[in-house]
Amino acid sequence: MQEQYQPAAIEPAAQKKWDDARIFNVSEDASKPKYYCLSMFPYPSGKLHMGHVRNYTIGDVLSRFKLLNGFNVMQPMGWDAFGMPAENAAMKNNVAPAAWTYDNIEYMKTQLKSLGFAIDWARETATCKPEYYRWEQWLFTKLFEKGIVYRKNGTVNWDPVDQTVLANEQVIDGRGWRSGALIEKREIPMYYFKITDYAEELLNDLDKLEHWPEQVKTMQRNWIGKSRGMTVRFAVSDDSKQGLEGDYAKFLQVYTTRPDTLMGATYVAVAAEHPLATAAAADKPELQAFIAECKAGSVAEADMATMEKKGVPTGRYVVNPLNGDKLEVWIANYVLWGYGDGAVMAVPAHDERDFEFAAKYSLPKKQVLQRVTIGLSPEQEEAMGFGGGSGCGAGYGDGSGSDSRDLPFMPNKWQAWYGVKDDFMVLINSGELDGMNYQTAFDAVAAKLQAIGAGEPKTQYRLRDWGISRQRYWGCPIPIVHCEQCGDVPVPADQLPVVLPENVVPDGMGSPLAKMPEFYETTCPCCGGAAKRETDTMDTFMESSWYFFRYMSPKFSDGMVDPAAAKYWGAVDQYIGGIEHAILHLLYARFFTKLMRDEGLVNVDEPFERLLTQGMVVCETYYRENDKGGKDWINPADVELTFDDKGRPVSAVLKVDGLPVVISGTEKMSKSKNNGVDPQELINAYGADTARLFMMFAAPPEQSLEWSDSGVEGAHRFLRRLWRTVYEYLKQGEAVNAFAGSQDGLSKELKDLRHKLHSTIAKVSDDYGRRQQFNTAIAAVMELLNQYDKTDTGSEQGRTVAQEVLEAAVRLLWPIVPHICETLWSELNGAKLWEAGWPAVDEAALVKSEIEVMVQVNGKLRGKITVAADASKADLEAAALATEGAVKFMEGKPAKKIIVVPGRLVNIVV
């Protein structure tokens, strides 16, 4: 065995050993329990970043742990290869996106292999390959025929210069990111998936996901947004019908979750695209200008929630069906046409957004909710937001101080007034509804509106149908042919895939496919006449919504997934990825699983049994202000820091010139802040095992990991120490058989070492398996090696115990630092580590013959005693009373009482 730890030599050798033995290439094996571990596949952007390293190391630790525990482990890898970055890079470098993507895949694959991940590369897939997206197109056509996929007009951001649709993130201050042109909203035909048909199941099945973070499930519940409310129809005033047709001339329909507050409505707001807005603007230039302004704004719901609320009155009126009040209709920029009916009733006294709007335009506010606090304690009032001098008022405002208080509306308390639906909130100023609580009023309003045909109860979801059309090139072609005679015709299965041409260099001006007659000119599958192929491509979330099933049988040519493989592998047992994917990707993956189940392709309801959302990798940021008032971000490697006596950075200078730079704080590693660390440089300097160890030891997996050069060096020191420990053991003689059998003849010191060993095995097993806390597992092995170093193992028995400890330590660490452990195992044992299995806990070793017990006097620690593990209560009391500390602090006084906690402490009360 060589004396020095040399990762550059041992890591390639270990990887070759695994590759030659094909230990990570798996197939269905009914004799073993299966374990499908999957980390979210990467976008082939060019290079791995530290977030990738952390993500895939977590998955690898779990995979290797299960492999040693006898599971049939599948850990595949592939590439989420379609998407906008490839098009942008293609335009920048004048290269086809396909060539750029495939080059990146090869480089990143080399990087992944250098980290020693236990990946079954025989299952590798790339979503831009026709053999992959063929089956995506096939499912699309099946669902189109069933009506689950449909076509309708959708609103998009249109760049009039580049003649293309832009994503919301490509619109900067209302202008196209590339052309700088003012963006327009346009209505264009798009394809949608009816995810709303599955909203209830998607919501209910969250309760089945026992091993998902609650935060993720809450985010999905909120995104689905189930609400119970009512559809309310406000009759259009007779003097407001001009220009309106059909039902729009009869009534304005809204959805509300608070029909109990209908008497508090003081105006109605509609979206700019609403027919009533269009009719009102016909002869009013100021309305036309405002509608144009709204249409030029963002189409993102999140942006609308935060933008300044603006509106204009239409001069049109509708009638409140409960009290006959005429309410003015406003066009407001915060109302979405694609959400619900594109109209909302406004109750400014009890809704934050409505209050903000009404205050801006001096619109009336009518309070219809009152908090009743009879019999409540001050503490209960405070908990509800109305106690402790909150300023919400006490009494009726007439000085009576009555216990039955009308707490007046305060805008800063709007949530307490409107968001709470309990018996402490009752209606006022609502006629016959006065005094009713939420539920009673809801039922009364529902009955009244239904009786007069002005509304009915309705359950609604915030979730919208999923629009998957993208007017871009680098994506999966939509398999539809447009025929003037037959309409929209799905491409037959025997004509799939519709192959995307790969030799295209986009110029950013419109859709390349729409300029290629050789692509779009075709014949109708139904009538054989001339037809045009769809030139939109699919949202790239489509590919990532089912790739985990394709891994089960990536070369299967008769369907999306081999039925036998799908039955064996079932759901992914462990999924790993960032919480930023909590809503879209994870929701779409759940949706696709249910679609595929309903097509008879898979036999599971949910795709991922257990979900781990790892934290970000963060690092310090530094900058200098430039002449333009901006910031030039400086890489941490180029900065020299000065620290105070507590190790905190107090100043920083640029190494090349010694001049100050600004310390800007810790942020996620990113190109924009220039605070990334290249994993390849780390691997070249310290080896893959050091990178893996640091990533797993620096923080629990679900928390952010702060980059630390000293932490990396510390990880490398530990691996050198591990190597040196085994080297020194073997230097003293050849490896022996590990200790086995009864430990009756062992010294106390060796028994203590074995106790530490087997308690460590138990802890590390729990840390890897149940808790998934890898940093504490590493710390436990470090503690074990510390005790090993302090134990004399020079005797013949000692060497057998030493062999047992070192063999176990190497296996315990193999999931995290597999290269060094593989090499050390070969030196210690000579066999194949992956065949050795996980070390078993010797229960006998956990039983200690002697234990240490604390001695207290009046509750304060005054000493410790070592006694037999089975010592009686009387023996413990006698031993404690005899200790030097007890004698000193009892000061000759008799013990009033002696409290014994078996195995832990004796407390003498004097």
From Swiss-Prot:
Motif, 'KMSKS' region: chain positions: 668-672
GO cellular component: cytosol
SUPFAM superfamilies linked to this entry: Anticodon-binding domain of a subclass of class I aminoacyl-tRNA synthetases (SSF47323), Nucleotidylyl transferase (SSF52374), ValRS/IleRS/LeuRS editing domain (SSF50677)
The keyword Zinc is annotated on this UniProt entry: no
PROSITE patterns in the record: AA_TRNA_LIGASE_I
EC nos: 6.1.1.4
Residue ranges of the motif 'HIGH' region: 42-52
Domain of life: Bacteria
GO molecular function: aminoacyl-tRNA deacylase activity; ATP binding; leucine-tRNA ligase activity
Binding of ATP, residues: 671
UniProt xrefs under HAMAP family: Leu_tRNA_synth_B (MF_00049_B)
Protein name as annotated: Leucine--tRNA ligase
Source species: Neisseria meningitidis serogroup A / serotype 4A (strain DSM 15465 / Z2491)
